[in-house]
Structures are given as structure tokens and as C-alpha cells.
Amino acid sequence: SSLKFENFLIMPPAYYKYGDEEVINFYSKIIESIPECKIVLYNFEKLCGYRFSVECVQKLVERFPGQIVGVKDSSYNLFENLKLDNFSVMPGSESKLLKGLELGCSGIITATCNVTSQLARKVYDDFLAGNDQTVNQKLCDIRNIFEKYNLISGLHTFYSTKDQFYKNVLPPLNTLNRS
């Protein structure tokens, strides 16, 4: 690309109803435009209205093995069943990290790891080393607190206690009321 970006996390187009073929065509156009790209698919039906199937992901990886390199699974329908060589599967929540690792996932991609990264890293490292899991429950508890609210508003509220900059949000987002 002219801007030298080559690695992307890309969600399918939102709003309109479409099927696997339209989604495959969408990613095909991107790859044709930027053949050197590496794409992590973003599976988040709640946000875009489309949920990847195992079959669709398999077709994309077969067609573009050098470009479609992983999936962030925030719909949680892939991380237990999708197994492909040289392909990373990453659930979108800390609460799925340990189970995901046990099933062969590569890790997680999650907004709240901005807060939980040290705990998530310990769970990951302890899993790889075969150590007892001493912080996984705490990690999941923190994630569960954020899930009670709008996640992004919760993150801004958390960070605004240290830096007023994080109070700057645009509607419909806002910081959480402390009461």
C-alpha cells in the first residue's frame, strides 16, 4: 500500500445482509489491492451482523494462505472448532484465554487487555510452562466487571482516574457515572 501498512485486523462490512460469497469477495478485493498484506479476520456478529463459519474461514485460508493469517473470534463460534495449520485463532475475551490455549489457540485480542495485560501474560506464560494457574480467576473476574458496562466507556472511566484525557469521548460513548 502507498502508506506502507501491510497488517490488518478487518471486520466484514456492516449493516447489509450478505453471505459467505460476498464476504470472500470483500477480502479478495483487499488482497488483490495489497497482495503483500497479512489479515486477521474479525469475527464479531454483534457489531457487524455477519458471523464467520468454519467453512468460510477455511475457504479464505485455502485461497489466500499467505494473507489470511488468523481470526479474532469475538462471536466465540470458531475458537473451539477451527483448526488450521499456520493460522492463529484468538478469542476476544480474557475469560476464554485459558480454554482457548488448551484447545490450541494462539492467545487473545481484547480491548480490556489494555488493563489486564500483565495478568493475561502470566496466564499465557504459566500455561506454556505447565505451571499451576494462579491468576486466571482474577483475570476473568476483572473482565466480568468490564462486561457489566459498555466496555469502551469502562476503559475510559478506568483510565480517566489517572489521566483526564480519557474523559474525552464522543457520544454515544460517555464515562461511567461513579454512583
Language model regions located:
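Glycine-rich, proline-tolerant flexible connector loops at the mouths of alpha/beta enzymes
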Residues: 1, 10-22
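Aromatic/hydrophobic pocket-lining residues that form the small-molecule binding cavity
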Residues: 1, 23, 27, 120
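Helix-coil boundary/capping segments in enzymes
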Residues: 1-4, 89
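Short beta-strands and strand-loop turn motifs
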Residues: 7-12, 37-44
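Short, small-residue-enriched loops and turns at beta-alpha junctions
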Residues: 14-19, 45-51, 174-175
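Alpha-helix N-cap and loop-to-helix initiation/capping positions
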Residues: 18-26, 52, 56
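Catalytic alpha/beta core domains of metabolic enzymes, predominantly
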Residues: 31-37, 44-149
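Conserved short secondary-structure transition element at the edge of the structured enzyme core
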Residues: 101-102, 138-174
